[in-house]
């Protein structure tokens, strides 16, 4: 059974802002923890979540982990992505979809905050 990791960022009209997600996707592919790794944007950019899900399914994913590349569990995560997960499950009944927690709060995030603050001083 192949498990896909689908990283989801908000999306931006600026390519350089979207590049962060593409870099993470590339690094996750190199690690090899998941058979399939794709990236998608909630809005303003492509690929959409639906398009990236199609890529996962066409590569044989039986399970797709939707991982919000967001810092907090706001409206986009709790409402929008939850609704999208439900729609994807309905549209792809042979595939299991799970929605992971966003990046923060996580103990490692505190270390990044400290590091960034020190770099700025």
What are these regions (language model features)?
Residues 1-121:
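Active-site-proximal alpha-helix that buttresses catalytic centers in soluble enzyme cores
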